[in-house]
Amino acid sequence: MSRRVRQRVEDNGKYKVDSPSYTVIGVEDLAPKVQQYVNWTSLPYDTVFHLFTRLNYRDRASLASTCRTWRSLGASSFLWSSLDLRAHKFDLSMAASLATRCVDLQKIRFRGVDSADAIIHLKARSLLEISGDYCRKITDATLSMIAARHEALESLQLGPDFCERITSDAIRVIAFCCPKLKKLRVSGMRDVSSEAIESLAKHCPQLSDLGFLDCLNINEEALGKVVSLRYLSVAGTSNIKWKVALENWEKLPKLIGLDVSRTTIDHIAVSRLLKSSQSLKVLCALNCPYLEEDKSYSSNRFKGKVLLAVFTDTFDELASIFADNSKKPKNIFSYWRDLIRKDKSIDEIMLWIEWIISHTLLRIAESSNSQGLNDFWLNQGATLLLSLMQSAQEDVQERAATGLATFIVVDDENASIDCGRAEAVMRDGGIRLLLELAKSWREGLQSEAAKAIANLSVNAKVAKAVAEEGGISVLADLAKSMNRLVAEEAAGGLWNLSVGEEHKNAIAQAGGVNALVDLIFRWPHGCDGVLERAAGALANLAADDKCSMEVARAGGVHALVMLARNCKYEGAQEQAARALANLAAHGDSNGNNAAVGQEAGALEALVQLTQSPHEGVKQEAAGALWNLAFDDKNRESIAAFGGVEALVALAKSSSNASTGLQERVAGALWGLSVSEANSIAIGHEGGIPPLIALVRSEAEDVHETAAGALWNLSFNPGNALRIVEEGGVVALVQLCSSSVSKMARFMAALALAYMFDGRMDEYAMIGTSLESTSKSVTLNGARTMALDQIKAFIKTFMEHQIFSTGALSSAPSMLAQVSERARIPEAGHLRCSGSEIGRFVTMLRNPCLVLRACAAFALLQFTIPESRHAMHHASLMQNAGEARGLRSAAAAASMPREAKIFMKIVLRNLEHQQAESPEGMKVSYNRI
């Protein structure tokens, strides 16, 4: 099981315009034996224009390729007044190709320095608005060139990430080159000098909205000289000299709104501003620690003034802006948007408030102290974000959705979210709203809404709500998007939803499997986020038997192997290996195990991934090899590709690794050791000492799996002797006596039984007489210790009263009681080969009575009807004619009492089984 939450990350998309040519044929009338075709070129132009406006750029290009008339309409400047290039690779060549369409371009949104450099090549002299994000690398030279080429510019916004390379020099150039500038918002500048601000005051007489956000230093006095300002934001700016600021800002004659959120302002400064500034109507001071220290502070005495702070009710405060506020609607934003008679001045204020609140809430959500504002988020923050998601301003909608995706995250790396916040979003109708945004034709909204849905879906209750509202189909459709950012977030949503067993089949039925596989083929290189999320979702889906077959049918095996072989991104490698592990984990219920092994390069790639420097990659690769080793051909191929050496090396280096890695490397060695040749090779490579060390682990999964590996290895006399010499007997005896896991104790007992069934004695005698005598003494002591522990282990499953009665009775009810008392449920997952079963049947005739009892106890575990492979084991015994030998052993006078009782149960089990299962794989564990 795995999932992932995401916060806002920097990424650049890759854009490719696909322009297929379609033959569009429609039936107009269906008269008998007559069929007429619609002439689509005769559609009214306004209808065609409406179609174009509802499409993204890529789909516009496809539609325009339909015919010459539509190609001409598709190039109309009416459709190219606004461009959002954030999701595309916008470079010089693309700028040149778009230039002829952008003569009348008025608004552009871009992402990153490469796109910024290319803007001037659009030759859009009439450009009015420029908005850019991920601007950390943009320099003064680039920004100055943009300003110089667009003298009609009225709005320039760069952020919310920091513009670290932009200085006051660029601001001066903007002021000089763009005299019509009305709005300027820049984030993260180090210093904003007085000269730069005074240049704005001098050359930009219409400048009414100014924001220097998250800056280090600004000149407070100079800001007081920009007398045209109606709205000023210095949110997040450090080192503000409040005395100087107050003296100058309170005199600004037109200042209506001031945003000082996330600054060091205190209640004294707030009171002075609200009292002294005659024009000021709205003061936003969210997340201001010094202001919030005074718990008794109230702004009620400042009539006609609105204070937005953590301790005020934002909706009530904003209601006072409206003339008729007696009803005070619950959601003032919805009330304002629904007003029939609009007030231009109020609209201007509310639009600014939407922008600054959405920006501040996102910044708070991203900050480390977000958890300290839990009451704020639960009481009004979540509701504010949902309200802002309904804004008419697209950037506000996106920022609110991003904030929603971020504020619920507690720990990104460990996929942990705040359940209270997530459920608050759900209670306020957030799921339905997000899904509506995800259906928008605007790809920016699709991306941010999908991200929020993905993060919220970490919570099981929210995931259920998403599914019930049709969210799975929405995400599956978005995963097919040609916009990489949209597809990436949608894949993340499917990844998180696919954790729930109840959602897996729904995802497959919605076409999610095909969409996820196609993503890997569509973006095989340089799109790490897409690949990791698609592979992660497929890994979760592959854990389900039916869905795993769907993944295979969709070409998932080939896609995942390609990813494991060629991708260099560790996150994608890890998820690809996990997906292959889960595909191979269904044993003989489907053919995926063999299919993965037969895929060219699969086994070799997984062996190579066990040598990755990244622990997660090594862990999942080892897990995949563990499952694949169930297949005889896979097992030998893994060894041929150096799997034994690689896994032994990994085991040797895993002493300080995670328990997950330790378990999987032990499991992979367990699976490979089924083969006698591999078993010997593991011993020769030095695999026994690290496995003994893992047997001593306190983690049940680790020591249980390591004991299983030693069980297989111990059948070889040479390995058995190595286990003795390396102190393995003591480790196994301790495990057999103290582990909480019955399964671990059982396998430790079986390993000890194999070691001391007499075959090792002859092997140990090889060498000089002195060495042989020494070995004999050592073995005798180890044998006594081992047999005593095996006997004690079996006794723990023998209740005196039940066994006393069982020895005298063969009544089914009595034998059922004994069987239930002796049963180890986990042992039902073990699947033995015919030779393995034969070893235990042979052990029934061993001179050692303890080993006879151990063999009978093991055969009981393998044939209990409730066990997964009981029918298979019964079939092996019946086909080999073992029933007669079992009856003879059960009737032998020398057979211990407990062994006789166990054998009665085994014979009864055989009578109830039908020989239907073919011979399968040998002893090992199946895991998902």
UniProtKB/Swiss-Prot annotation:
Places the protein is found: Nucleus
Family matches, as SUPFAM superfamilies: ARM repeat, RNI-like
Main location: nucleus
GO BP terms, alphabetized: lateral root development
Annotated protein name in UniProt: Protein ARABIDILLO 2
Phylogenetic classification of the source organism: Eukaryota, Viridiplantae, Streptophyta, Embryophyta, Tracheophyta
Keywords: Nucleus, Repeat, Ubl conjugation pathway
Role noted for this protein: Promotes lateral root initiation and development, independently of auxin (IAA) and abscisis acid (ABA).
Domain F-box per the UniProt entry, residue ranges: 37-83
Tissue: Expressed ubiquitously.
One of the record's GO cellular component terms: nucleus
Motif (Nuclear localization signal): 3-8
UniProt family annotation: Belongs to the beta-catenin family.
Start and stop residues of the ARM repeats: 147-186, 237-278, 303-341, 370-409, 419-458, 460-499, 501-543, 545-585, 591-630, 632-674, 676-715, 717-757, 824-864
